[in-house]
């Protein structure tokens, strides 16, 4: 199929080996089965096609020590890491974050044997909120009837009600740019986001990511952090 349709490769999003959380069947052997799957896919794809995988922020359920040699990119799903009233995709820890953050997710994967040049940081183009908000709030629906605030510690925006209570965590241009700067500073492979349709029609968030991470045509390097 990759040859027939001229595809770059295959991405595997198995949520998650040995776990039933996504309503799928599982086996205690699935961590090993995942390694075997990566091995067999690499044999079929050869060296010219990409083989990538999506992983939980904690880096659990996959034996990277044995399977990373088959994989080109590891797309870390560094979102949905906490439920409201905590932010689901903080860069760093704060009073609005849970125990897992984007920074912690990167460190977990490095500890488990994923090289920095194979690590891709995930960014959500949606928010997670409390009632009366839906659990999943596309970006264009975010800025209505509440006050926007910024966490300097976690480097993410959030919304509060009239009493100052956290009601919604989301991303904006400032926060995705902060994550892009983190990627550059830690020499990681790049970024991915979920999902394209959740951005504004004019593409505020995806444009910010592209401008920060894609090579500068004149300098031949990634975008540089602006002076503060």
Q: Where do the protein language model's features map onto the residues?
A:
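Short acidic, glycine/proline-enriched helix-loop-strand junctions
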Residues: 25-33, 47-48, 200-225
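Active-site rim elements
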Residues: 92-96, 163-171, 192-197
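Conserved active-site loop/cleft motifs that coordinate metal ions or position small ligands
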Residues: 120-122, 190-195
């Amino acid at each position: 199929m990759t040859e027939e349709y001229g595809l770059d490769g295959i991405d595997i999003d198995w949520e998650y080996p040995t776990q039933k959380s996504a309503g799928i069947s599982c086996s205690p052997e699935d961590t090993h089965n995942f390694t075997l799957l990566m091995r067999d896919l690499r044999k079929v794809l050869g060296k010219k096609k990409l083989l990538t995988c999506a992983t939980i922020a904690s880096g659990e359920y996959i034996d990277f020590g044995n399977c990373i040699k088959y994989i080109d990119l590891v797309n870390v799903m560094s979102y949905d890491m906490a439920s409201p009233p905590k932010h689901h995709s903080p860069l760093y820890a704060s009073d609005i974050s849970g125990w897992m953050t984007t920074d912690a997710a990167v460190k977990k994967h490095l500890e488990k044997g994923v090289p920095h040049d194979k690590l891709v940081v995930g960014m959500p183009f949606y928010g997670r909120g409390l009632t009366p908000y839906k659990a999943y709030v596309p970006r264009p629906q975010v800025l209505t009837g509440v006050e926007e605030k910024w966490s300097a510690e976690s480097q993410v925006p959030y919304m509060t009600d009239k009493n100052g209570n956290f009601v919604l965590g989301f991303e904006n241009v400032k926060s995705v740019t902060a994550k892009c700067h983190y990627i550059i500073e830690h020499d990681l492979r790049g970024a991915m986001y979920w999902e394209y349709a959740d951005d504004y029609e004019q593409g505020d968030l995806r444009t910010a990511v592209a401008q920060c991470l894609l090579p500068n045509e004149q300098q031949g390097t990634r975008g540089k952090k602006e002076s503060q």
